[in-house]
Swiss-Prot record:
Family: Belongs to the class-I aminoacyl-tRNA synthetase family.
The organism of origin for this protein: Streptococcus pyogenes serotype M12 (strain MGAS2096)
GO biological process terms held by the UniProt record: arginyl-tRNA aminoacylation
Gene3D superfamilies for this protein: Arginyl tRNA synthetase N-terminal domain, HUPs, Isoleucyl-tRNA Synthetase, Domain 1
SMART domains: Arg_tRNA_synt_N, DALR_1
Name recorded for this polypeptide: Arginine--tRNA ligase
Length: 563
């Protein structure tokens, strides 16, 4: 139990008028540590108890069980709690040393599934930095949900269907070179895609031709299907090479095409429930009662189905297949209206489990303030970017530690980790401007900064030849140690907050805070001095490294032992 929860529970025992959660949220940290570690303001009880806050504070301070604390005192309208730092630090260090990387493991999920729709690049288009956000946010959430006791199911809902394949077939038939595509599939397909879109802006017949080829593809035309399959196979080979570099895996690659034969059931269900309404020749579902002005367009007047029809089929399939406790869609914020419609249509169909679906939206990645666009050829491709990040990391490692063993593997961990961490430390609803130099810096709020703090601790532990004993009691009560202990003790709550809010930036900011607190401690404390506190300080180092490494793992970032 963390200290805030402990205090809230003790106050709740003597204040039945307030819920423990309400008490927890009212607790404050005094500006001056001389006034205690945490304080409860009695103002909120004045109306209920019909007494002055000062009197309430004084009376309650007398009733609270002090055995858990150093002391409890009333100061004006506040009850100030002074924590028994030696006792708490001993408990926290024992928990981390005993549990190791399992420290803060929770059982909220009880093994239930969480479906995570993530990454989902478009076939025959390059994997750009724009796709990175969905990939790394989804991968981090998968680790977080597992830490909360759920079983994550990572689904790469590939963009392997749609009019763009009509465009690509037209482009390939006009200008394609089979040998060139086989040699450099994504590069060549991107050139074709950009070229055909540029031509379509001045020639309206291109769109008509593309629509015709896509119709052929839908009808199972042999030539169209073979080209589509080839584009898909070549793209997947390239994507999987990139996923290997990022250390990201998936449980399913069922993309849009997988649901081609599952949409008729959706239409039948909607018709059976009398939810389809004709509007200008199209079939729609009205959603005004959900506060959604625009109806969901299920089927166009030409009989073509739409994304929402496919996503309805996917939602039904995933519920039946995984019986998920949560279904999470890590997709850009521009799709917010689509996911509101999706949930509302499922609700109209009588599926209350739609309440368990969440659109985990995120902001845009820009470059020099400009929006990225595959269609216009304005993209930052991931593969060369990762290579450059690794090279930059290698240069810094060479300068700092030229004799480091396994430099290549460490440079990979630092370079890839830097890109992931920079993305994840940003509140997901905010966008960010892509700046590789800032990402790979060993200074500031970066992945390499946190990784370096972890490596520094491992170096200290190696130098001291220290391994903590689960049967030894370690405790510290000094101010610098206490700052670290408080953060380590807060780790379970940070994991829960990250999970509840689908917000990996909470975890990334925690990792930065812990690394900063340790570096401050390192600067002011002679850790290896041979005195009575040495083992206690080394136990704190061990616990800090354990939690830092686990925090980075939850962000899908490696923590090298040497850098």
């Amino acid at each position: 139990m963390d200290t805030k929860t402990l205090i809230a529970s003790e106050i709740a025992k003597v204040v039945p008028e307030l819920e423990q959660d309400a008490i927890f949220n009212l607790l404050e940290t005094p500006k001056n540590s001389d006034m205690g570690d945490l304080a409860f303001p009695a103002f909120s009880l004045a109306k209920v108890l019909r007494k002055a806050p000062q009197m309430i504070a004084s009376e309650l301070a007398e009733q609270i069980d002090e055995s858990q604390f150093e002391k409890v005192v009333a100061v004006g309208p506040y009850i100030n709690f002074f924590l028994d730092k030696a006792k708490i630090s001993s408990q926290v260090l024992e928990q981390v040393i005993t549990a190791g990387s399992d420290y803060a493991q929770q059982d909220e999920g009880q093994g239930r599934n969480v479906a995570i729709d993530m990454s989902s690049p478009n076939i025959a288009k390059p994997f750009s930095i724009g796709h990175l956000r969905s990939t790394v946010i989804g991968d981090s959430l998968a680790h977080i949900f597992a830490k909360m006791g759920y079983k994550p199911v990572k689904i790469n809902h590939l963009g392997d269907w749609g009019k763009q394949f009509g465009m690509l077939i037209v482009a390939y038939k006009k200008w394609g070179d089979e040998a060139a595509v086989q040699a450099h599939p994504i590069d060549e397909l991107l050139k074709l895609y950009v070229r055909i879109n540029a031509e379509a802006e001045t020639d309206p017949t291109v769109d008509e031709e593309a629509r015709e080829w896509f119709r052929k593809l839908e009808d199972g035309d042999k030539e169209a299907t073979e080209l589509w399959q080839w584009f898909r196979d070549e793209s997947l080979l390239e994507f999987n090479r990139l996923y290997d570099q990022l250390h990201v895996t998936f449980d399913s690659y069922n993309g849009e095409a997988f649901y081609n034969d599952k949409m008729d059931e959706v239409l039948d269900l909607l018709e059976a429930k009398n939810l389809l309404v004709e509007s200008k020749g199209a079939q729609v579902v009205n959603l005004e009662k959900y506060g959604i002005e625009h109806p969901a367009l299920i089927k166009k007047s030409d009989g073509a189905t739409l994304y929402i029809t496919r996503d309805l089929a996917a939602a039904l399939y995933r519920k039946r297949t995984y019986d998920f406790a949560k279904s999470v869609y890590v997709v850009g914020n521009e799709q917010a209206a689509h996911f509101k419609q999706l949930k509302a249509v499922l609700k109209e169909m009588g599926y209350d489990w739609s309440d368990d679906m969440t659109h985990v939206a995120f902001g845009l990645v820009t470059k020099g303030g400009a929006k990225l666009s595959t269609r216009k050829g304005n993209v930052i491709l991931l593969e060369p970017t990762v290579a450059e990040a690794i090279n930059r990391a290698a240069s810094q490692i060479e300068a700092k530690n030229p004799n480091l063993a396994d430099k290549e593997a460490v440079a990979h961990a630092v370079g890839v980790g830097a890109i992931k961490f920079y993305d994840l430390k940003t509140d997901r609803m905010n966008g960010y401007d892509f700046d590789l130099e800032a990402m790979v810096s060993f200074e500031g709020e970066t992945g390499p900064y946190v990784q370096y703090a972890h490596a520094r601790i491992q170096s200290i532990l190696r130098k001291a030849d220290f391994t903590p004993s689960a049967t030894t009691t370690y405790s510290l009560a000094d101010a610098e140690s206490w700052e670290i202990i408080k953060l380590i003790q807060d780790f379970p709550r940070i994991i829960k907050r990250t999970s509840d809010n689908f917000e990996p930036s909470i975890m990334a900011k925690f990792a930065i805070n812990l690394a900063q607190s340790f570096n401050k401690y390192y600067a002011h404390t002679r850790i290896l001095d041979d005195n009575s506190e040495r083992d206690n300080r080394l136990a704190l180092c061990y616990a800090t490294a354990t939690v830092l490494k686990e925090a980075l793992r939850l962000l899908s970032v490696d923590a090298p032992n040497e850098m």
